């Protein structure tokens, strides 16, 4: 009964207005009130503040500052094997596995279209058809910065407007095409492991999605698809990120989806739906690598 109520609220509540209100409030400096809200959040969600660079909740001027708190450098060691890719975020695996043609598994009884997820981009869809995917859900208590699974050269970013349904196991099991319907930021990289996409998916109360190269991508929510492109690594204006380096962040919640081309990586056998993830641990192992020189000179 409670689950039905939660799902019903997802359909009838003014999600955009709630999200904008939450984003506004989370960015305000409230002094003692801000500290009280942060303390209540830490208590309710059992957030481990010992991992944070600033464990004292009084040191955060806004709730957003707390939510995107950086961790101590040693809190998340990054796997150094050059043939292994690493998990991009703390959280839990929602689903992972092969992309069956154009279909990605969402939950029992639900798949969604790769092309729909990629906003109808046929060229990008062809890169990842029959490849591999990993969907990672970030719970409220988790660290909400997102990092690189491997070295990468940014080539394309697409902002896709959409719904702002809550993203959690309940909605994944009951709302068809959830990840292809919600607002999202698609980032495509050239890597030694072939093309890779990392998608930051919005949700109700996700005040903003940011990247390290562009700052805040959303809001504003203008309702139109936006696309940016970047040159190869040896050209002026290139964006090159290293394995384990931060690439983006959520100011409140949501989900990261990774896409890999066919025949390039083997996902870690230890990872299954529901597995807890820690940034920097092994995500996948190379099956086929390109030379760094070839990656640097991709057209």
From Swiss-Prot:
Pathway(s) the chain acts in: Phospholipid metabolism; phosphatidylethanolamine biosynthesis; phosphatidylethanolamine from CDP-diacylglycerol: step 2/2
Post-translational modification: Is synthesized initially as an inactive proenzyme. Formation of the active enzyme involves a self-maturation process in which the active site pyruvoyl group is generated from an internal serine residue via an autocatalytic post-translational modification. Two non-identical subunits are generated from the proenzyme in this reaction, and the pyruvate is formed at the N-terminus of the alpha chain, which is derived from the carboxyl end of the proenzyme.
EC number(s) recorded for this UniProt protein: 4.1.1.65
Top enzyme class: lyase
Cofactor dependence: pyruvate
Main location: membrane
Modified positions (Pyruvic acid (Ser)) in chain numbering: 254
GO CC list: plasma membrane
GO annotation terms (biological process): phosphatidylethanolamine biosynthetic process
Catalytic site positions: 90 (charge relay system), 147 (charge relay system), 254 (charge relay system), 254 (schiff-base intermediate with substrate)
Record field: catalytic activity: a 1,2-diacyl-sn-glycero-3-phospho-L-serine + H(+) = a 1,2-diacyl-sn-glycero-3-phosphoethanolamine + CO2
Cell location: Cell membrane
Residues the UniProt record annotates as site (Cleavage (non-hydrolytic)): 253-254
Family matches, as InterPro entries: PS_Dcarbxylase, PSD-B, PSD_type1_pro
Pfam family name, one: PS_Dcarbxylase
Membrane topology recorded in Swiss-Prot or TrEMBL: Peripheral membrane protein
Functional description taken from the UniProt entry: Catalyzes the formation of phosphatidylethanolamine (PtdEtn) from phosphatidylserine (PtdSer).
HAMAP family named among the record's database cross-references: PS_decarb_PSD_B_type1 (MF_00662)
Quaternary structure note: Heterodimer of a large membrane-associated beta subunit and a small pyruvoyl-containing alpha subunit.
Name this protein carries in UniProt: Phosphatidylserine decarboxylase proenzyme
Organism per entry: Erwinia tasmaniensis (strain DSM 17950 / CFBP 7177 / CIP 109463 / NCPPB 4357 / Et1/99)
Gene assigned in the entry: psd
């Amino acid at each position: 009964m409670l689950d039905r109520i939660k799902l019903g609220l997802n359909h009838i509540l003014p999600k955009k207005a709630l999200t904008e209100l939450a984003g506004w409030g989370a960015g305000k400096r409230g002094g003692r009130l801000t500290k009280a809200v942060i303390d209540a959040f830490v208590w309710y969600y059992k957030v481990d503040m010992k991992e944070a660079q600033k464990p004292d909740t009084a040191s955060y001027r806004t709730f957003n500052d707390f939510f995107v708190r950086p961790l101590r450098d040693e809190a998340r060691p990054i796997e150094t094997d050059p043939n292994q890719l690493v998990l991009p975020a703390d959280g839990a695996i929602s689903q992972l596995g092969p992309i069956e043609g154009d279909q990605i598994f969402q939950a029992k009884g639900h798949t969604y279209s790769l092309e729909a997820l990629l906003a109808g981009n046929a060229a990008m869809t062809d890169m990842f058809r029959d490849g591999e995917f990993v969907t990672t859900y970030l719970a409220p208590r988790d660290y909400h910065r997102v990092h690189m699974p491997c070295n990468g050269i940014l080539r394309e970013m697409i902002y896709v407007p959409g719904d702002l349904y809550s993203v959690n196991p309940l909605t994944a099991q009951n709302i068809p095409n959830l990840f292809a319907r919600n607002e999202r930021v698609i980032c495509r990289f050239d890597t030694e492991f072939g093309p890779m996409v990392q998608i930051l998916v919005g949700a109700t109360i996700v005040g903003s999605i940011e990247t390290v190269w562009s700052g805040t991508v959303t809001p504003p929510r203008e309702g139109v698809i936006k696309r940016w492109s970047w040159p190869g690594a040896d050209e002026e204006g290139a964006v090159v990120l290293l394995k384990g380096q931060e690439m983006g962040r959520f100011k409140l919640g949501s989900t990261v989806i990774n896409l890999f081309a066919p025949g390039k990586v083997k996902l870690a056998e230890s990872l299954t739906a529901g597995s807890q993830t820690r940034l920097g641990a092994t995500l996948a192992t190379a099956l086929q690598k390109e030379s760094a020189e070839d990656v640097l000179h991709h057209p």
